[in-house]
Amino acid sequence: MKKQKIAVLGPGSWGTALAQVLNDNGHEVRIWGNIPEQIDEINEKHTNTRYFKDVILDENIKAYKELSEALDSVNAILFVVPTKVTRLVAKQVAELLDHKVVVMHASKGLEPGTHERLSTILEEEIPSEMRSEIVVVSGPSHAEETIVRDITLITAASKDLETARYVQGIFSNSYFRLYTNSDVIGVETAGALKNIIAVGAGALHGMGYGDNAKAAVITRGLAEITRLGVKLGADPLTYSGLSGVGDLIVTGTSIHSRNWRAGDALGRGEKLEDIERNMGMVIEGISTTKVAYEIAQELGVYMPITTAIYKSIYEGADIKESILNMMSNELRSENEWDKK
């Protein structure tokens, strides 16, 4: 593929890792961020020690403080900013863009208040001629592994499969491989909702429970993710793929996962405000829990794990008691995930 100019919006761990993948493939990569010291560090020392202590980035990766400079004559834009600021950044991008580009995002969450998926936010904010070609990049991936070029397989989802194949082409190489999918709703809901289940799995670990309990919360968590996703219009088969069960396994079992670590700390009795302060990173599963709970209540979707975590985080219920209470819920058929 011809060399592309790509703006990566967000110099966090995942944005930095994806920037390196694109750079390895010979593309011109421009990272944009709003922390001056971090941008200077990337340009001058070729490091991003806020997230990676021992990683040296390629000198060809450039970082920008001015969004207009990062966007100048690019072929594609990759949003990797926290969910809560995606709309704000998209508005800024829309004001500055003077040509058509491919718009991608690699964040996982649901917007508080509106309950919207990130591609919907982008559709509402970017120029109309680009709205049908938004691509979601999502799947089982720890930035800590991708940055050292461990094998990673994820999904590129778009209503327009030709654009999804373009994204597949700019990212794929010997250690990083993308598969295409047209089910944007399924891929996005899987990526957002698995963070809630990861909090639950981490909490079980923090409370001292073993593998049986963790396997139960992950598999039953997948059932309620699917239940809500299908209600929203997703294809249930998507949840058996990379962006579904694959991402849930990675996030729900690993110490690399900030959502799992947050749950682990909650399970050990730490206060949420202390956990967020100590981590110094966005824990998307916390805000997504509230959004998912509200959607489930509105649509009448049975989500017991999400409800238990919501009650412990937002209503002050004891997390151990909330989780154990699920054991006394009505007995159900495993195969009737789409029914109450």
Curated annotation (Swiss-Prot):
<dbReference type="InterPro" id="IPR008927">
    <property type="entry name" value="6-PGluconate_DH-like_C_sf"/>
</dbReference>
<feature type="binding site">
    <location>
        <position position="194"/>
    </location>
    <ligand>
        <name>sn-glycerol 3-phosphate</name>
    </ligand>
</feature>
<keyword id="KW-0560">Oxidoreductase</keyword>
<feature type="binding site">
    <location>
        <position position="13"/>
    </location>
    <ligand>
        <name>NADPH</name>
    </ligand>
</feature>
<keyword id="KW-0443">Lipid metabolism</keyword>
<keyword id="KW-0520">NAD</keyword>
<dbReference type="InterPro" id="IPR006168">
    <property type="entry name" value="G3P_DH_NAD-dep"/>
</dbReference>
<feature type="active site" description="Proton acceptor">
    <location>
        <position position="194"/>
    </location>
</feature>
<feature type="binding site">
    <location>
        <position position="14"/>
    </location>
    <ligand>
        <name>NADPH</name>
    </ligand>
</feature>
<feature type="binding site">
    <location>
        <position position="258"/>
    </location>
    <ligand>
        <name>sn-glycerol 3-phosphate</name>
    </ligand>
</feature>
<feature type="binding site">
    <location>
        <position position="257"/>
    </location>
    <ligand>
        <name>sn-glycerol 3-phosphate</name>
    </ligand>
</feature>
<feature type="binding site">
    <location>
        <position position="282"/>
    </location>
    <ligand>
        <name>NADPH</name>
    </ligand>
</feature>
<protein>
    <recommendedName>
        <fullName>Glycerol-3-phosphate dehydrogenase [NAD(P)+]</fullName>
        <ecNumber>1.1.1.94</ecNumber>
    </recommendedName>
</protein>
<comment type="pathway">
    <text>Membrane lipid metabolism; glycerophospholipid metabolism.</text>
</comment>
<keyword id="KW-0444">Lipid biosynthesis</keyword>
<comment type="similarity">
    <text>Belongs to the NAD-dependent glycerol-3-phosphate dehydrogenase family.</text>
</comment>
<keyword id="KW-1208">Phospholipid metabolism</keyword>
<feature type="binding site">
    <location>
        <position position="284"/>
    </location>
    <ligand>
        <name>NADPH</name>
    </ligand>
</feature>
<dbReference type="GO" id="GO:0006650">
    <property type="term" value="P:glycerophospholipid metabolic process"/>
</dbReference>
<keyword id="KW-0521">NADP</keyword>
<dbReference type="InterPro" id="IPR036291">
    <property type="entry name" value="NAD(P)-bd_dom_sf"/>
</dbReference>
<dbReference type="GO" id="GO:0005829">
    <property type="term" value="C:cytosol"/>
</dbReference>
<dbReference type="Pfam" id="PF01210">
    <property type="entry name" value="NAD_Gly3P_dh_N"/>
</dbReference>
<dbReference type="GO" id="GO:0047952">
    <property type="term" value="F:glycerol-3-phosphate dehydrogenase [NAD(P)+] activity"/>
</dbReference>
<comment type="function">
    <text>Catalyzes the reduction of the glycolytic intermediate dihydroxyacetone phosphate (DHAP) to sn-glycerol 3-phosphate (G3P), the key precursor for phospholipid synthesis.</text>
</comment>
<dbReference type="InterPro" id="IPR013328">
    <property type="entry name" value="6PGD_dom2"/>
</dbReference>
<keyword id="KW-0594">Phospholipid biosynthesis</keyword>
<dbReference type="GO" id="GO:0046168">
    <property type="term" value="P:glycerol-3-phosphate catabolic process"/>
</dbReference>
<feature type="binding site">
    <location>
        <position position="143"/>
    </location>
    <ligand>
        <name>NADPH</name>
    </ligand>
</feature>
<dbReference type="InterPro" id="IPR006109">
    <property type="entry name" value="G3P_DH_NAD-dep_C"/>
</dbReference>
<dbReference type="InterPro" id="IPR011128">
    <property type="entry name" value="G3P_DH_NAD-dep_N"/>
</dbReference>
<dbReference type="Pfam" id="PF07479">
    <property type="entry name" value="NAD_Gly3P_dh_C"/>
</dbReference>
<feature type="binding site">
    <location>
        <position position="259"/>
    </location>
    <ligand>
        <name>sn-glycerol 3-phosphate</name>
    </ligand>
</feature>
<feature type="binding site">
    <location>
        <position position="108"/>
    </location>
    <ligand>
        <name>NADPH</name>
    </ligand>
</feature>
<keyword id="KW-0963">Cytoplasm</keyword>
<feature type="binding site">
    <location>
        <position position="108"/>
    </location>
    <ligand>
        <name>sn-glycerol 3-phosphate</name>
    </ligand>
</feature>
<keyword id="KW-0547">Nucleotide-binding</keyword>
<dbReference type="GO" id="GO:0005975">
    <property type="term" value="P:carbohydrate metabolic process"/>
</dbReference>
<dbReference type="GO" id="GO:0046167">
    <property type="term" value="P:glycerol-3-phosphate biosynthetic process"/>
</dbReference>
<feature type="binding site">
    <location>
        <position position="139"/>
    </location>
    <ligand>
        <name>sn-glycerol 3-phosphate</name>
    </ligand>
</feature>
<dbReference type="GO" id="GO:0051287">
    <property type="term" value="F:NAD binding"/>
</dbReference>
<feature type="binding site">
    <location>
        <position position="247"/>
    </location>
    <ligand>
        <name>sn-glycerol 3-phosphate</name>
    </ligand>
</feature>
